[in-house]
């Protein structure tokens, strides 16, 4: 009897160690994301509980990169799509959902501040925190297992701490800066204005650098 009990315990231990028993239907699933900030946040929150990849190859210009019909069909075979509904990502999300009515979706953009570029989503601490809140909440809504939910909550708290430290550092830098002017090629750094910086965009709406901008550059370089 003792030998049977020991054998049973060994089998159970082996199953648990090899991960053969899933705690939740959302564990071990295949998740696709769009832009890198969403991929990063999802990996920070869900870590090894799912296979997480982006629809965009790393290093490509997502403004110019176009997915093929075959790629969209392949991506539709995944279990969950997380995307930015404030961009053309929603077009891809619509196509993928049409190809697979059962795929779960999360729009991570709810409540985001106005963005001036895709870079603004990644660089702005307020936006990255909102992404994290949305993804955490939507993942928790899909998950039944309380332990997995708590794991995501703990990961969120660590990520929130990192974001808060970045926000504090930006405030400290702005406060201690004698020259608060920042020259940027585009509007991707415009969010820094809320910290007290003056952001000067080299490229205006007509794509030309005017004399006022040249004077600003000269003043900045001579400081």
Tell me the role of every PLM-derived stretch.
Residues 19-223:
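Extracytoplasmic metal-acquisition and chelation regions
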Residues 1-20:
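Secretory targeting signatures
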